[in-house]
Amino acid sequence: MEARLKELKQKALELIEEAKELKGLNDVRVAYLGKKGPITEVLRGMGKLSAEERPRMGALVNEVREAIQTRLEDKISNLEKAVIEAKLATETIDVTLPGRPVETGCHHPLTAVVEQIEDVFIGMGYEVAEGTEVEKDYYNFEALNLPKDHPARDMQDTFYITEETLLRTHTSSVQARTMENNKEKGPIKIICPGKVYRRDDDDATHSHQFMQIEGLVIDKNIRMSDLKGTLQVFVKKMFGEDREIRLRPSFFPFTEPSVEMDISCMMCHGKGCGTCKGTGWIEILGAGMVHPNVLEMAGYDSKEYQGFAFGMGAERIAMLKYGVDDIRHFYTNDVRFLQQFKRA
């Protein structure tokens, strides 16, 4: 038995030395130290030895097993180290090479347009007011002269969360809250930018979510001419000094009288083209004098205070300003499209 153990040890160490891969070493471990290996078989036969031989043979078996185990661990460590070194050799980085430039981002065109619009109105003394996108039905409709049974509610399909809670369909709700909170202080001069939501089918000119910017002025002796002058300044700042405006009668429940504003086409300069559908004019926003009912519901005396309001879509302004033909481009995150506006 002693001679057999020495032979097993020598053979195992030779196989370990010859192994070139981790799989070969695992095969040696299973063959010699596994449950069905010769070392285990010797241990099972220890019971047949005399009491005098058993301690000596037990020590020899342990010595052989430890020698094989130690050599296996050393060889495995060496092979793993060699694998890592070979991998590192193929992945060597030449630190003298120039680094890859980091691509710089840019303002999203909608962000750029909203900031430009804000700058124009801040320059005219307006403040920026913001509000919650999840709104109560009261502030989105009722406080704006749209009671629950008003037929004009059908003009806007709404995302309702509960019977009295919804995703705002316009930022006019910010105006309603501002008027209510400011009735003791008097005059108001604000613009309200923010996301709004309507149940529209997405296409080239419509989106279920879009950016809207509304304006509100409340003070004594406010007239329609003040509204027109304000919008003229805005248009010339945004689209150039040669742009003209015209106001057409319209209807909005929260303003009276109500108008829609067109600007002279920047493509054909009023001569008529495909962009303006041959009219020479392009519609960009709605506006009007604040309805007396809206003033009264907010706590203002409509005989003492008047006001005007206007609202526009940031996407609409951006499409006209930059010649974008599909509103969906603003939301597809196409880097090729966005890179065009690095200087926007």
From Swiss-Prot:
One of its GO terms (cellular component) is cytoplasm. Keywords: Aminoacyl-tRNA synthetase, ATP-binding, Cytoplasm, Ligase, Magnesium, Metal-binding, Nucleotide-binding, Protein biosynthesis. Its cofactor is Mg(2+). Binds 2 magnesium ions per tetramer. It is an enzyme of class 6 (ligase). Its main location: cytoplasm. It is found in: Cytoplasm. Its EC number is 6.1.1.20. One of its GO terms (molecular function) is phenylalanine-tRNA ligase activity. It catalyses: tRNA(Phe) + L-phenylalanine + ATP = L-phenylalanyl-tRNA(Phe) + AMP + diphosphate + H(+). Mg(2+) binds at E256. Tetramer of two alpha and two beta subunits. This is Phenylalanine--tRNA ligase alpha subunit. It comes from Bacillus cereus (strain B4264).
